[in-house]
């Protein structure tokens, strides 16, 4: 009986291996056209180390594995969810925005020629607000793919490079982070350019460091809202999100030396910020963030994703997924959709994301 069992097991494993190999054949080609390709073709279960989830945020049906929706990208970012739970995300080096449809699991190309969009979010009218890094602009993209430029400067100077965006659901005001990640494709001859000094301490001394900006509803002028004395302009503000009541803003900063933080601010009635507090300390490679219905903060960065409660306690770790950004999506708003350099992944959750509309 043992020999027969082992023989049968070997046959099944062999069949399974070639089946998986067949399903994954397209993603080995870096030049594959992902347009109109069913994500179910690529969807696999990726073994990862055990999730840290002491409070049961992840659905029991996930069985401790990370779902890979699709591979073969260059650098995915900016996942934004629409009213139907669909996710739009960028492949920044390839200057494309893709759409994942919640009802079918299909991934299609939404837009080519995106201004190298990075962080994105939908407004209440269904327009996609995108941080277009190519020329330091903030775009408003219509459902048909056409766009208008909302802003392209601060006080007449180029932005460093809009990175991520959050829209206050109570009034439509827009917050963006503007860290200093000098890009080789920026036009150094532009007379509006800021002085990108060699060191961040010099940038801080001249007031040209990373900041957070606010665009009020109906305005075309950015307001710098990180003007408090406690703000250190010698940092890279990166991920940004806020509470559904529009009263609290969270901003993290990207570092590689363990000095990263998640900061919390009170949002004033005029959109300015006050009462800056440090929620979490000693972080690395912080990137995009989202919130769930309990107020927990999900932070992408480095090799995975971590979540923290309102008091800054770590309550979740998902290794291997969500290295750049994350958003709650799906038809029931209980799918954690994560972007990483070469792939998009997901985890079914027990909790819902905050309602954005």
Q: Can you describe what each PLM-predicted range is?
A:
Residues 1-4:
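Positively charged n-region of N-terminal signal peptides that target proteins for export
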Residues 22-357:
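Sequence-structural signature of mature extracellular/luminal beta-sheet repeat domains
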Residues 17-19:
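C-terminal motif of bacterial Sec signal peptides marking the signal peptidase cleavage site
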Residues 6-14:
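Sec-dependent N-terminal signal peptides
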